[in-house]
């Protein structure tokens, strides 16, 4: 039975804007209050999905969430008609309006942590929705994310859905952005690598400038929920010093595929025992770990963050080599591009690079890896997935036409209070649920 890594990319929402909501994400802060183009953002994402599908990779689409999140505003004490609520919140709390209008669910690497059937004791694929409780604008995503995943992976024989962990600091969970899987074929047992920023109970090393969003306790809880064998799980601490330089998730400083771990020299807390444990566990599944460590002398942490070199997709090719999917910013950084040029000619596993323009997402701090949720599936499981979300030439055309019909080509903060934007969004999402055969996944569809 064949195995695949299926990438489910988030479709950028209609309220995509630059509000600087994500403290610790330097691109988000740098582009605060600049003009956004939601239509272009959505099309840039769709082009990447289509290009990878055309190369033969399994590619799915995850829909955006309803924004502004009117239910959240009502929960926070705003009342009256939708028009009255928007008018009041823009006057009394403009930052709150921006937060409940964020299109951040596009970064589906934070949607959930996923464990394949080959790794779980019950032989099923497990999903735990991330609580994202470090940032309010992201913490409000969990319920709709859960509804979306349950609609797409809707077969209890193959898929298990867990609620988000308790939304408290001790169990801060950022999903797959702090999770890697190392092994061989995708349908064979592998080692799951959970990367955390701090320990809630024991304390220890922590960043001082920016928050460590993922806790060890959260990672351990997810491993338990997913029924993982402790001998096939490793918990690694991210280097607090790089968090303080803008590495707010591990996928900004490392990426893996099969038996290859591509990471910066300073990505993790130096601990030879952890790497020895990882190599030992890899040996038990008859796999040899291949690490590609990028020296700080060639690419600094600052250059890695500004270029998003590691916020890339590492994909297996038919010839046994690997393709690295990078944002245009990596090509534009001389040190990074020089390193990559050497890398693909070094005889190692990575022999090709593909560059994508994702600038609208990148200005908010989200590159190729942020935009996708990896789900390893076998043939039977893939057949059980809602096929309407899988990228095809016909779906690409349908979604592009949908974007052209519904998305604005410029958006400023003042537009978020426009009741017409809310109605445009609801009409668009209602139509999208029909295109993707998702059912009623949005709150407004239950009014």
Swiss-Prot record:
Example of a GO MF term: N-succinylarginine dihydrolase activity
PANTHER family per record: N-SUCCINYLARGININE DIHYDROLASE
Keywords: Arginine metabolism, Hydrolase
One of the GO BP terms on file: arginine catabolic process to succinate
Organism: Yersinia enterocolitica serotype O:8 / biotype 1B (strain NCTC 13174 / 8081)
Enzyme Commission no: 3.5.3.23
InterPro entries noted in UniProt: AstB_sf (IPR037031), SuccinylArg_d-Hdrlase_AstB (IPR007079)
SUPFAM superfamilies (UniProt xref): Pentein
Reaction catalyzed: N(2)-succinyl-L-arginine + 2 H2O + 2 H(+) = N(2)-succinyl-L-ornithine + 2 NH4(+) + CO2
Summary of the function given for this chain in its UniProt record: Catalyzes the hydrolysis of N(2)-succinylarginine into N(2)-succinylornithine, ammonia and CO(2).
Pathway: Amino-acid degradation; L-arginine degradation via AST pathway; L-glutamate and succinate from L-arginine: step 2/5
Binding site for substrate: 19-28, 110, 137-138, 213, 251, 364
Family to which this protein belongs: Belongs to the succinylarginine dihydrolase family.
Protein name per Swiss-Prot or TrEMBL: N-succinylarginine dihydrolase
Assembly, per entry: Homodimer.
Enzyme type, top EC level: hydrolase
Active site residues according to the UniProt entry: 174, 249, 370 (nucleophile)
Gene name in the database record: astB
Biological classification of the source: Bacteria, Pseudomonadati, Pseudomonadota, Gammaproteobacteria, Enterobacterales
Domain of life: Bacteria
């Amino acid at each position: 039975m064949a195995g695949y890594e299926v990438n489910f990319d988030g479709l950028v929402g209609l309220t995509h804007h630059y509000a600087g909501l994500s403290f610790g994400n330097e691109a988000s802060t740098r582009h605060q209050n600049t003009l956004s183009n939601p239509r272009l953002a959505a099309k840039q994402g769709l082009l990447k999905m289509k290009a990878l599908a055309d190369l033969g990779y399994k590619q799915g689409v995850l829909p955006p969430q309803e924004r502004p999140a009117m239910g959240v505003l009502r929960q926070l004490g705003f009342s009256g008609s939708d028009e009255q609520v928007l008018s009041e919140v823009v006057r009394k709390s403009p930052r709150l309006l921006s937060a409940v209008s964020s299109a951040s669910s596009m970064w589906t690497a934070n949607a959930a942590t996923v464990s394949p059937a080959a790794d779980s004791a019950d032989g099923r694929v497990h999903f735990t929705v991330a609580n994202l409780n470090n940032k309010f604008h992201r913490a409000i995503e969990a319920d709709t994310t859960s509804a979306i995943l349950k609609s797409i992976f809707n077969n209890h024989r193959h898929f298990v859905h867990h609620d988000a962990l308790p939304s408290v600091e001790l169990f801060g969970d950022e999903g797959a952005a702090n999770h890697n899987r190392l092994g061989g074929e995708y349908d064979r047992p592998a080692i799951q690598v959970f990367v955390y920023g701090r320990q809630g109970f024991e304390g220890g090393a922590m960043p001082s400038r920016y928050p460590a969003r993922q806790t060890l306790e959260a990672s351990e809880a997810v491993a338990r929920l997913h029924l993982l064998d402790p001998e096939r799980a490793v918990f690694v601490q991210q280097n607090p010093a790089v968090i303080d330089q803008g590495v707010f998730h591990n996928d900004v400083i490392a990426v893996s595929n099969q038996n290859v771990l591509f990471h910066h020299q300073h990505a993790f807390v130096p601990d030879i025992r952890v790497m020895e444990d990882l190599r030992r566990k890899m040996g038990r599944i008859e796999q040899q770990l291949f690490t590609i460590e990028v020296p700080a002398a060639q690419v600094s942490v600052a250059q890695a963050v500004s270029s998003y070199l590691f916020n890339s997709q590492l994909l297996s090719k038919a010839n046994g080599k690997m393709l690295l999917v990078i944002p245009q910013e990596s090509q534009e950084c001389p040190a990074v591009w020089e390193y990559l040029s050497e890398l693909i000619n070094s005889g190692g596993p990575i022999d090709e690079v593909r560059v994508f323009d994702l600038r609208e997402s990148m200005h908010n701090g989200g590159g190729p890896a942020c935009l996708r949720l990896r789900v390893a599936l076998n043939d039977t499981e893939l057949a059980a997935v809602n096929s309407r979300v899988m990228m095809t030439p016909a779906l690409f055309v349908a979604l592009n036409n949908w974007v052209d019909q519904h998305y604005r080509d410029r958006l400023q903060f003042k537009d978020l209070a426009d009741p017409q934007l809310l109605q445009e969004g609801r009409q668009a999402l209602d139509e999208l649920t029909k295109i993707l055969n998702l059912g009623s996944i949005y709150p407004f569809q239950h009014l």
